[in-house]
UniProtKB/Swiss-Prot annotation:
Keywords assigned: Porphyrin biosynthesis, Transferase
Upper lineage: Bacteria, Pseudomonadati, Pseudomonadota, Gammaproteobacteria, Pseudomonadales
CC cofactor note: Binds 1 dipyrromethane group covalently.
Protein name: Porphobilinogen deaminase
Molecular function as annotated in GO: hydroxymethylbilane synthase activity
Cofactor: dipyrromethane
Family: Belongs to the HMBS family.
Record organism: Pseudomonas syringae pv. tomato (strain ATCC BAA-871 / DC3000)
Length: 313
């Protein structure tokens, strides 16, 4: 095995560093003697913590700086949370590995109440996600949704300080950082459909680096990849990013894949649902099919309004 070095571009947040260390350990396990180093950096999304993601606008808030490092040969691979990865890549870069998915569900976290249903009317719930907000308010219009940004530790500290009655976070991030005991209850995907790619880690690199592609191959998890391909295809067809109220979740059923999609008005007054099944080999086309079903119900009008609000800020 080559003794060449692989440099991993990563954000500096605790969760991003966990993901990078996970990939580092997997690479070292698969290729003894391989030197793997981290290249930590700060993304635009990490700097702009005083505004909701939906108000900042733009795509690639958490990946652009990492992609620049790849393009300028300051790193060999970049490790991302798949839900943060834009649908399109800069010329010369691509997604060449998707690791096995962690729990994709949203997590209800509270120090006082056992579940979303147990929250009294008027309770304050923290989330930075319009996707979560739309589904929460559709189920519980009596709740107050309050803006919540920052890393996992910061969000938990705000809950502990009494700023919120409960907060909603990705279960995967809590599990990976050792905070599984803070999950009061996992929210069923039937009640809160996840973001596309939620819980999965992806690895981006230069398209021409065949040696890097070969080194990444043992880390690739095909079942997860099929699911994420279907979800990302839906997102792409709806021109979605990580800051819009689009949800999608795919599961494998034998040789088929079942994809559910949702577009919601942030007020929770309108939730559009669609789903379909197709052979796993048609995962990408399935995403387009479900997206088209959502568009036929009026999804474009909801998303146009959301993008308009972001652009007017």
């Amino acid at each position: 095995m080559s003794s060449r070095e692989i440099r991993i571009a990563t954000r500096k947040s605790a969760l991003a560093l966990w993901q990078a260390e996970y990939v580092k350990a997997r690479l070292e396990q698969a290729h003894p003697g391989l030197l793997v180093t981290l290249v930590p950096m700060v993304s635009r999304g990490d700097k702009l913590l005083d505004s909701p993601l939906s108000k900042i606008g733009g795509k690639g808030l958490f990946v652009k700086e990492l992609e620049t490092a790849l393009l300028e040969d300051n790193a060999d691979i970049a490790v991302h949370s798949m839900k943060d990865v834009p649908m399109d890549f800069p010329q010369g870069l691509g997604l060449f590995c998707i690791c096995e998915r962690e729990d994709p569900r949203d997590a209800f976290v509270s120090n006082t109440f056992e579940s979303l249903d147990a929250l009294p009317a008027g309770s304050i719930v923290g989330t930075s996600s319009l996707r979560r907000q739309a589904q929460l308010l559709a189920r519980r219009p009596d709740l107050q949704i309050r803006f919540l940004r920052g890393n996992v530790n910061t969000r938990l500290a705000k809950l502990d300080a009494g700023e919120y009655n409960a907060i909603i976070l990705a279960a995967a991030g809590l599990i990976r950082l050792g905070f599984e005991d803070r999950i009061t209850s996992a929210i069923s995907v039937d009640d809160s459909l996840p973001a596309g790619g939620q819980g999965a880690v992806g690895i981006e690199c230069r398209s021409v680096d065949a040696e890097i592609h070969a080194l990444l191959a043992p880390l690739h998890h095909e079942d997860t990849a099929v699911r994420v391909i279907a979800e990302r295809s839906l997102n792409k067809h709806l021109n979605g990013g990580c800051q819009v109220p689009i949800a999608c979740y795919a599961v494998l059923e034998g040789d088929d894949v079942w994809l559910r999609g949702l577009v919601g008005d942030p007020s929770g007054r309108v939730l559009l649902h669609a789903d379909a099944r197709a052979p796993q080999t048609s995962a990408q086309a399935l995403g387009v099919q479900v997206a088209e079903a959502l568009l036929a119900q009026g999804a474009a009008e909801i998303l146009k309004a959301v993008y308009g609000e972001a652009n007017n800020e």
